[in-house]
Amino acid sequence: MLARVPLLAGLTLLAIAIAIGSVVIGHGIRDRNRNDVITVTGSAKKRIVSDYVVWDLSVTSQQPSAADAARELAGWTASIRSFLTKQGVQPGELTVNPVSTETVGSGTIKGYRLTRSFEIRSPRVRDIATVAEHSSALLAGGVPLSADAPQYVYTKLPSLRPELLAEATRDAQHRGRVLVDATGAHLGGLRGVDVGVFQVTSPNSTQVEDYGVYDTSTVDKDVTAVVNVTFGVG
């Protein structure tokens, strides 16, 4: 009877060891399956047309006296207003800012520099672009106009993002399936998504920035979305 005790104890320990080993092996299989993943980059691009424009311009007069500079600036301001009105710019689209004044000279004042700035904001993108193209007529008429290039923006970008992200994700899934099918495996479910920044560029541009690009120089633009999607592999 006493001889059977060590035997029973040994069999019990063996059974426990087998059970523990099975658990470890089982976890190992599950971990391996959990780690069988593939991360694929997908992208989507859409051509859009800007729906808003901002155009900044200014004129500066410099004269020995403030009064002379003010008179000259007033004449040029009237010419600019008249030009913009004739070109079809609406009163609600035009902002005329107050005059800014600087003195010329260090210590002794040698003159005064007065500047008037204007800003046009409008959803009539093509019309304002045409006005900007014709603004050289002011220079030809003796008005020393200083004008920035119009800035063209797209105000509906937030509503476009979901559509592009969905398309980019489908693109990643297609790419992943092609890669995995070539190995005889099966593309599994979604494990994770990393959304990149949106790039808004001029048409067919290859410009890419880590923090995103927002080009305002062209009316037509390309919006590109990029996602990195991780799928399981079976």
Located regions from the model:
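Short, charge-dense linear interaction motifs
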Residues: 1-234
